[in-house]
Protein backbone atom coordinates (compact mmCIF):
# COMPACT_ATOMS: atom_id res chain seq x y z
CA UNK A 1 0.00 0.00 0.00
CA UNK A 2 1.43 3.36 -1.01
CA UNK A 3 0.87 6.44 1.09
CA UNK A 4 -0.33 9.70 -0.40
CA UNK A 5 2.41 12.32 -0.73
CA UNK A 6 1.29 15.68 0.68
CA UNK A 7 4.67 17.42 0.48
CA UNK A 8 6.73 16.88 -2.66
CA UNK A 9 9.81 18.62 -1.22
CA UNK A 10 10.38 18.57 2.53
CA UNK A 11 13.06 17.93 5.12
CA UNK A 12 13.30 15.84 8.28
CA UNK A 13 15.85 16.86 10.91
CA UNK A 14 17.40 14.71 13.61
CA UNK A 15 18.64 17.32 16.11
CA UNK A 16 21.32 16.70 18.73
CA UNK A 17 23.34 18.87 21.11
CA UNK A 18 26.27 19.59 18.76
CA UNK A 19 25.03 18.54 15.32
CA UNK A 20 21.98 18.06 13.11
CA UNK A 21 21.36 15.38 10.50
CA UNK A 22 19.11 16.58 7.66
CA UNK A 23 17.27 14.57 5.03
CA UNK A 24 15.42 16.24 2.15
CA UNK A 25 12.91 14.11 0.27
CA UNK A 26 12.05 15.26 -3.25
CA UNK A 27 9.22 13.36 -4.96
CA UNK A 28 8.91 13.51 -8.75
CA UNK A 29 5.76 13.36 -10.89
CA UNK A 30 6.01 9.54 -11.02
CA UNK A 31 5.95 9.26 -7.23
CA UNK A 32 9.63 8.36 -6.87
CA UNK A 33 11.38 10.03 -3.96
CA UNK A 34 15.05 10.98 -4.05
CA UNK A 35 16.78 11.75 -0.76
CA UNK A 36 19.56 14.24 -0.14
CA UNK A 37 21.28 14.02 3.23
CA UNK A 38 23.82 16.12 5.07
CA UNK A 39 25.15 16.75 8.57
CA UNK A 40 25.56 20.22 10.08
CA UNK A 41 26.91 21.72 13.26
CA UNK A 42 24.20 22.95 15.63
CA UNK A 43 26.13 26.17 16.25
CA UNK A 44 25.45 29.45 14.42
CA UNK A 45 27.66 28.79 11.38
CA UNK A 46 26.22 25.31 10.89
CA UNK A 47 22.66 26.58 11.20
CA UNK A 48 23.33 29.17 8.48
CA UNK A 49 24.82 26.40 6.30
CA UNK A 50 21.70 24.29 6.91
CA UNK A 51 19.45 27.19 5.93
CA UNK A 52 21.50 27.79 2.76
CA UNK A 53 21.45 24.05 1.90
CA UNK A 54 17.67 23.94 2.25
CA UNK A 55 17.30 27.02 0.01
CA UNK A 56 19.68 25.51 -2.57
CA UNK A 57 17.31 22.53 -2.84
CA UNK A 58 14.17 24.75 -2.80
CA UNK A 59 13.07 23.07 0.42
CA UNK A 60 10.98 25.34 2.62
CA UNK A 61 9.04 22.82 4.75
CA UNK A 62 10.96 21.30 7.65
CA UNK A 63 10.04 18.94 10.49
CA UNK A 64 12.03 18.03 13.60
CA UNK A 65 11.47 16.37 16.95
CA UNK A 66 11.27 18.46 20.08
CA UNK A 67 14.40 16.94 21.60
CA UNK A 68 15.13 18.69 24.89
CA UNK A 69 16.04 22.32 24.31
CA UNK A 70 18.26 21.63 21.27
CA UNK A 71 15.47 22.35 18.77
CA UNK A 72 15.11 26.00 19.86
CA UNK A 73 18.07 27.61 18.02
CA UNK A 74 17.35 25.48 14.94
CA UNK A 75 13.72 26.60 14.97
CA UNK A 76 14.66 30.26 15.51
CA UNK A 77 16.99 30.32 12.49
CA UNK A 78 14.86 28.24 10.11
CA UNK A 79 11.52 29.93 10.85
CA UNK A 80 12.89 33.01 9.06
CA UNK A 81 12.89 31.19 5.70
CA UNK A 82 10.92 27.96 6.21
CA UNK A 83 7.68 26.61 7.55
CA UNK A 84 8.93 24.61 10.55
CA UNK A 85 6.92 21.85 12.21
CA UNK A 86 7.92 20.68 15.65
CA UNK A 87 6.86 17.13 16.47
CA UNK A 88 6.57 15.34 19.79
CA UNK A 89 8.92 12.31 19.75
CA UNK A 90 6.02 9.92 20.42
CA UNK A 91 4.67 10.77 16.93
CA UNK A 92 7.99 10.10 15.21
CA UNK A 93 8.75 6.75 16.82
CA UNK A 94 11.39 5.13 14.62
CA UNK A 95 11.07 1.86 12.78
CA UNK A 96 12.35 -1.32 14.40
CA UNK A 97 15.85 -2.49 13.58
CA UNK A 98 19.20 -0.78 13.31
CA UNK A 99 18.62 2.81 14.36
CA UNK A 100 20.95 5.48 12.99
CA UNK A 101 20.70 9.24 12.86
CA UNK A 102 20.59 9.08 9.06
CA UNK A 103 17.63 6.68 9.20
CA UNK A 104 15.91 8.79 11.88
CA UNK A 105 16.11 11.93 9.71
CA UNK A 106 14.79 10.00 6.70
CA UNK A 107 11.95 8.52 8.78
CA UNK A 108 10.92 11.98 10.02
CA UNK A 109 11.05 13.20 6.41
CA UNK A 110 8.87 10.29 5.22
CA UNK A 111 6.28 10.79 7.96
CA UNK A 112 6.18 14.53 7.29
CA UNK A 113 5.95 14.00 3.53
CA UNK A 114 2.85 11.83 4.05
CA UNK A 115 1.33 14.27 6.57
CA UNK A 116 1.55 11.72 9.38
CA UNK A 117 3.02 14.04 12.04
CA UNK A 118 0.89 15.96 14.48
CA UNK A 119 2.57 19.35 15.08
CA UNK A 120 3.33 20.52 18.61
CA UNK A 121 1.96 23.85 19.78
CA UNK A 122 4.57 26.59 19.99
CA UNK A 123 3.30 29.74 21.68
CA UNK A 124 3.95 33.01 19.86
CA UNK A 125 7.08 34.80 21.06
CA UNK A 126 5.03 37.51 22.82
CA UNK A 127 3.03 34.90 24.75
CA UNK A 128 6.10 32.86 25.66
CA UNK A 129 7.98 35.95 26.83
CA UNK A 130 5.12 37.34 28.90
CA UNK A 131 4.69 34.05 30.76
CA UNK A 132 7.93 34.58 32.68
Language-model regions, residue ranges each:
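Phosphate- and other anionic-substrate recognition elements at nucleic-acid/protein interfaces
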Residues: 1-132
Amino acid sequence: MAFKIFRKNCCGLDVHKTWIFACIGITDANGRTEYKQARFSSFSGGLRELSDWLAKHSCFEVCMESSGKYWIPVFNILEQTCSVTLAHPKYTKPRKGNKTDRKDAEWICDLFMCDMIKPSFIPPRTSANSAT
